[in-house]
Amino acid sequence: MPRVEVGLVIHSRMHARAPVDVWRSVRSLPDFWRLLQVRVASQFGDGLFQAGLAGALLFNPDRAADPMAIAGAFAVLFLPYSLLGPFAGALMDRWDRRWVLVGANTGRLALIAGVGTILAVGAGDVPLLVGALVANGLARFVASGLSAALPHVVPREQVVTMNSVAIASGAVSAFLGANFMLLPRWLLGSGDEGASAIVFLVAIPVSIALLWSLRFGPRVLGPDDTERAIHGSAVYAVVTGWLHGARTVVQLPTVAAGLSGLAAHRMVVGINSLLILLLVRHVTARAVGGLGTALLFFAATGLGAFLANVLTPTAIRRWGRYATANGALAAAATIQVAAAGLLVPVMVVCGFLLGVAGQVVKLCADSAMQMDVDDALRGHVFAVQDALFWVSYILSITVAAALIPEHGHAPVFVLFGSAIYLAGLVVHTIVGRRGQPVIGR
């Protein structure tokens, strides 16, 4: 056999073995395997809850929403926790993270029961949004705790790969949860009663996540009591949560650069989300067609993110975090321009490609925080990331809602999104250059 053909055969066999090797690596890390199971169950519940809530608020014949109402709903859901998240992060860096996961999931169960009851009795939007606000805040708390705990159950040289595995598994689970919502909605209707049943179903995966969180031993998930740990009372640690988290980000250019790129991406996601929701709300069968089209767009974005989870570890090993994130931001700016025609099929394709680019940026930021931040401060920094994640989203969606017409035809905002990506690229390039060389960069 010619040498070239032999090389191709060997190369193809290596690629065929890659998923098997990753699976063996996962199963060889028992605590990571348990953590992955908690993530999968938790994010299935997240996807089901968020899709059910979106259907109840935006595609519900018993309720109606204009652009500002949509933006207001997102703000009430995410902004308060985003501002308080870094304070909660202080607790993740002081308390056994196993008990943080247990406590947060217990609180989620109580809130799920409350939100389901509010929908069942047909109460107004305010109590519904307040209940959903707290439930979603606890879900984000769980997500931050899982990310902060990962370096404790994975060897340093495998952090990037296993983080991609964890995020990919969680994304698939959330996608399945969101789409599972369509079954009870189809069976029970698109009104408040059907939405209530969907929310009550969320208790099943959250209960599983709660029980699986109990399998970890004391302090297996951290935090470590290193020399950089914040001592003093828990009240002091909570009150200074924002300060310690923000200061750590500023002191580490690799982390600051990653978060700047992530913030730019989330701003564009906010604009695109509002545009697609407004466009599909004018589909004739609003309760079915409009929601189905919106789910198709978000599913395409999620599929792109899943693909990024597969590609990013290889890209980082070949080009490093800095160059990989820069390339993703540059590609995103170009892809965004292609959606300016506001044709829904084109927007779905662009959503897929932006899902790839945006998730690459996020994974680069995640690896910087997991590898460059002291464990005693990692919870603070992940909470800051979570805050930035949602503040950027809400800020852009609120500004856009004040200016975009109700029918959603505003191509200039798509082009503005491309400019935001370019701004994020510039900031990431300048700030990232100041970072000292570290392993995995």
Curated annotation (Swiss-Prot):
Similarity comment text for this entry: Belongs to the major facilitator superfamily.
Single biological process term from Gene Ontology: response to antibiotic
Keyword Cell membrane: yes
Spans traversing the lipid bilayer: 68-88, 110-130, 131-151, 164-184, 194-214, 229-246, 260-280, 287-307, 337-357, 384-404, 412-432
Record's protein name: Uncharacterized MFS-type transporter Rv0037c
Domain of life: Bacteria
Gene3D superfamilies according to UniProt: MFS general substrate transporter like domains
Pfam families documented for this protein: MFS_1
Native organism: Mycobacterium tuberculosis (strain ATCC 25618 / H37Rv)
GO CC annotation: plasma membrane
Membrane topology value: Multi-pass membrane protein
Protein's cellular compartments: Cell membrane
Keywords from the named record: Cell membrane, Membrane, Transmembrane, Transmembrane helix, Transport
GO MF: efflux transmembrane transporter activity
SUPFAM superfamilies: MFS general substrate transporter (SSF103473)
